């Protein structure tokens, strides 16, 4: 089956609707035979804000795990029509141009 990389970006890890989504999704996916690689951004070592520097070992590790996955599933509450800052920062650093995508000329 598929390997699913789950990125959880909510500060309330025990009593939130997002936590219920995370737990239900992971449980049901495992029942179907999928492998789950879950990170909780609030439990991980904090990553710096994007400043244009070379990616850290932590970011390279996230990219490696993503490359080994078939599916990326991100979970975050929506504040002012946006994901949480911690998830948006993760997206900026991990899913960066030239590595995750490129622009056509």
Where are these regions (language model features)?
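Secondary-structure boundary/capping signal
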Residues: 33-36, 98
């Amino acid at each position: 089956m598929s390997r699913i990389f789950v990125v959880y970006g909510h500060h309330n890890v025990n009593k939130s609707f997002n936590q219920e989504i995370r737990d239900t999704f992971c449980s049901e996916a495992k029942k179907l035979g999928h492998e789950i690689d879950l990170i909780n951004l609030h439990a991980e070592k904090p990553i710096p804000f994007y400043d244009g520097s070379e990616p850290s070992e932590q970011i390279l590790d996230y990219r490696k795990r993503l490359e080994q996955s078939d599916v990326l599933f991100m979970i975050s509450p929506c504040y002012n029509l946006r994901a949480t800052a911690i998830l948006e920062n993760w997206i900026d650093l991990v899913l960066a141009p030239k590595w995750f995508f490129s622009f056509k000329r």
